[in-house]
Structure formats: C-alpha cells, structure tokens
C-alpha cells in the first residue's frame, strides 16, 4: 500500500467519523428519549471519535511523511491519538459498569447512577486519558537519544518525525497496551459475561415462579438486548485495535524478527482509525430510537423534507384540528420527559416534565397551546386515517421512557 493510497483512505475515514459521530451527538441533543445517563457516556465516546477525525488522523498523516520537527512537537502529534484511544476505552468501561448496575441491582440504579455523577466520571476519564496518553511528554521518550541521520537530514535539535523514533516501544507495550488497553478490555469481557449470566438466571426464575413487583420478562429482555449491542461495540473496538498492538509486541519482544513491512503497518493503522466510524452504524442497526432520530435528522436537515418526528416507535404527528372560534388545540404525548417539537427542536423549558406538547394554531404551525387534550388511542389511529376530522382529539399512550426501551429489537 503506497503512501498516497494510505492518505486517501485516512481522509475518507476522517470524514465518515466526523459525520457519523456528529449525527450521534445531534440525535441525543434533539431527542429527549435519548438524554439519559448511559448516553452521556455514548456522547463522550462519540466526541473522542470526532476528535480522531478532526485531529488524530491529520496528525497521523503528517507523521507518516517523516517531516523534520522539534522532538517534543513531533511527540505531541504522536501521543495525541493515544489520548483519544484511552478516552474511548474509559467510556466503554463506564458503559459496561452502568449496564451491569442496571441489570444486577435495578432497584438501586436511579439512586446510584445520576446525571451529575456521570458527568463527573466523564470529566475524570478525560483527565486520566490526557495524563496517560501524554506521559511520554514528561520524559519517557526517545528525544534524548542522538540520531546521527536525523541531525544530518534535519539539523541540530530536530528529528525526522516518525512514531517509533520518538515514542519508546516499552511504553507502548507495557504501559499503554498491557496496563490501559488489554486490562480494561478483559475487565469489560468479565463484566458483560456476568451481565448475561445474571440475566439468564433471572429469566429462568421468572419462568419458574414469577414474584410480584419484579421486572417483567420483556423489560429484562430489553436490558439484555442493550447489553448485547454495547458488547458488540466493545468487540469491534478490540478487533480494530488489537492488530496494531500485536505488531508492536512482536517488534518489542522479538528483536531478531523482521520488522513489519510498511503496507502492514498502514493497514493496521487504518483498521484502528476505522473504529471511529463503526459505532454510529451499530447504533442505527441495533437501537430503534437512534435509528428513527437519524432518519428524522437526515430527512429534515439533509434532504429538506418536513415530516413528523417519531420517538419510541410512536409518531408525534400534528393534528390539524381547531374549534370554529379558531382557538388552539394541542396534542400531548404522555409518559415522555421534556421532548421535542415536530420540527426537531427542543421544547420550551416551561413544558410539563411528563410529556411534550405540539401546539397547532389556525395556520397549522407548531406553537404554544393554552390547553392540553387527551383522546383514546383508537381515535388517534382513526384520526390518522381521516385527517380531515374536526373535533377529534387524540391521546397517544406512550410508556415511560427508559434507556433500555431504546434498544428494543426492531
């Protein structure tokens, strides 16, 4: 693989990583059903993947050219991608622990896992990621080693900027890989294994003698589906990053082995960066709420088609009904937290916390409504078939939104 092919593929990955993960953050921003503790960690993971596309990949392309630079400047370029990798690892670990608590001790979940605590954990994860990734900047580097070839080519105090020339391989293997990549991955493997074993045991108990007050079988199955989706993301992370680390291990432990050819190194680097692209596809394929919100964003903001917003499988459609005096009528979808308008924007902060309201004036535009109205679900369905009906008001009974319900199988 030539350098021009490598650069072209890297740029394509960068664009896809930015677009896909911006879509994830956008979906969480506009859909209140996605605004929960677990998705705080998902957004943190998406932010790291956006930074890979914006910064890490351009840095990697720059380093691949072997340009002349001050050693510590080159070192910062080389280490920055390690910061983002570490942030992704910590986000995945936090998600695994969050799902473990949700399944093992569901009655205590809301008390233990709060938004404030989640944001604090995310902040700590990012601080630790910078500390671990930038450790070579503090002295664990090759800058003190004199390279006659670099001095001859680049001049005194400057080096040929290549990753292995500035970052020591013992740091990459012992510290970065063994301590902060492999160990967290094994921990996540153990957590998800315990999640599935606990869920299996609970499902068997429900079949034999269901106890009053326990979660229903369908709720637990949704939790398991959620855990499977996130376990897939962890598995893909390992699949994308382990080849590069395995090559580093061979380089470090087998001094007599032939160094990996450039095409293999390029392929391993591309595979590691491609991990930043795959997560949005997993969300879209496995998580119904994300999939519906992605469609809404693309159709409304990319294709410029105005259509009703869907959340949790229920349509938030505008009911064109008003009285003969022209007074406004609104449709409230019960069971939801603060929601979104039909055009995808957030509701007013003064809305009731148990639902969102679509106000329709005489002109049919969404606006504030003086009163909420409720109708049977059957009439709502009939109203969709006969949009010209006047005076029919609809109540769409939507169950309380929970994070696990987003993961209900399609």
UniProtKB/Swiss-Prot annotation:
Question: How is this chain modified after translation?
Answer: Ubiquitinated. Deubiquitinated by USP4; leading to stabilization and expression at the cell surface.
Where in or outside the cell?
Answer: Cell membrane
What tissues harbor this protein?
A: Expressed in striatal neurons (at protein level).
Q: Say which domain of life the source belongs to.
A: Eukaryota
According to its record, what is known about the domains?
Answer: The cytoplasmic C-terminal domain is necessary for targeting the non-ubiquitinated form of this protein to the cell surface.
Q: Which PANTHER family match?
A: ADENOSINE RECEPTOR A2A (PTHR24246:SF47), OLFACTORY RECEPTOR AND ADENOSINE RECEPTOR (PTHR24246)
| Name under which the protein is recorded | Adenosine receptor A2a
Name its species: Rattus norvegicus (Rat)
Query: What is the gene called?
Result: Adora2a
